[in-house]
Amino acid sequence: MSTCGRKALTLLSSVFAVCGLGLLGIAVSTDYWLYLEEGIILPQNQSTEVKMSLHSGLWRVCFLAGEERGRCFTIEYVMPMNSQMTSESTVNVLKMIRSATPFPLVSLFFMFIGFILSNIGHIRPHRTILAFVSGIFFILSGLSLVVGLVLYISSINDEMLNRTKDAETYFNYKYGWSFAFAAISFLLTESAGVMSVYLFMKRYTAEDMYRPHPGFYRPRLSNCSDYSGQFLHPDAWIRGRSPSDISSDASLQMNSNYPALLKCPDYDQMSSSPC
């Protein structure tokens, strides 16, 4: 991968991580995951009359119609004890939603840790392991979030299937924008995790590619030799020596490969004495 492509992928993963973290934070802190509406069907003209309407999040429920209009309560205390404005189906749905609450919180924690590690990895590119660890945290965050979303949906669907249907009443529900933010956050988080792991693999491969093999290094020839580098690369060794040294080395190598075949004969010493 080229340097430009790697930088673009790094920037894209950072943007996805920021958007995913922001959307999930908004989704967890707001009360627009689910809209519920209860009413009766008037037999005269088959019109409907809304008896209760509310929107709920992971922590609170706020009424939009009925005697409690404009008031919000926590999920544990859906409404005052003397109020009978909600049916058993609504109460059961709001109670079952609590089983899915821990998973978005765990997902938010994992996403925050992955975001911090990812930024540190971008600031210090030589620490390639941080990209891998942040990618793992992003993937775990996405898995935790999708488990929470599945539990949230299944809790509502189970209650709808077990609910006793009545021809005189109706019960409608729809998912709100907080739920949509959480779903989009899952897609962004998983994408950021996959890109972080991919960047780690590319950086690790590039490091292995440009790391010289130990066999390419030249060992020390002798302790008192001019070739004093114990692990000197051959190319650097050639570039670091002067032309005269290189020619001397070539002549020495030629003499060692082609020894002299003829030797100077030994002459007997001639005496100058007349005897």
Curated annotation (Swiss-Prot):
Organism of derivation: Rattus norvegicus
Keyword list, A-Z: Cell membrane, Membrane, Postsynaptic cell membrane, Synapse, Transmembrane, Transmembrane helix
Subcellular location: Membrane; Postsynaptic density membrane
Entry's transmembrane regions: 8-28, 103-123, 129-149, 181-201
Record bears the keyword Cytoplasm: no
Function: Regulates the gating properties of AMPA-selective glutamate receptors (AMPARs). Modulates their gating properties by accelerating their rates of activation, deactivation and desensitization. Displays subunit-specific AMPA receptor regulation. Shows specificity for GRIA1, GRIA4 and the long isoform of GRIA2. According to PubMed:18817736, shows only specificity for GRIA2 and specifically to the form of GRIA2 for which a single amino acid in the pore region has been edited from a glutamine to an arginine residue. Thought to stabilize the calcium channel in an inactivated (closed) state.
A Pfam family that the UniProt record links to this protein: Claudin_2
Family per similarity comment: Belongs to the PMP-22/EMP/MP20 family. CACNG subfamily.
GO biological process: positive regulation of synaptic transmission, glutamatergic; postsynaptic neurotransmitter receptor diffusion trapping; regulation of AMPA receptor activity; transmission of nerve impulse
Self-association and partners: The L-type calcium channel is composed of five subunits: alpha-1, alpha-2/delta, beta and gamma. Acts as an auxiliary subunit for AMPA-selective glutamate receptors (AMPARs). Found in a complex with GRIA1, GRIA2, GRIA3, GRIA4, CNIH2, CNIH3, CACNG2, CACNG3, CACNG4, CACNG7 and CACNG8. Interacts with GRIA1, GRIA2, GRIA3 and GRIA4.
Record-level Gene Ontology MF annotations: channel regulator activity; voltage-gated calcium channel activity
Domain of life the protein comes from: Eukaryota
UniProt key word Glycosyltransferase: no
GO cellular component: AMPA glutamate receptor complex; glutamatergic synapse; postsynaptic density; postsynaptic density membrane; postsynaptic membrane
Protein name: Voltage-dependent calcium channel gamma-5 subunit
Primary localization class, coarse: membrane
Bilayer disposition of the protein: Multi-pass membrane protein
Coiled coil (UniProt feature): none
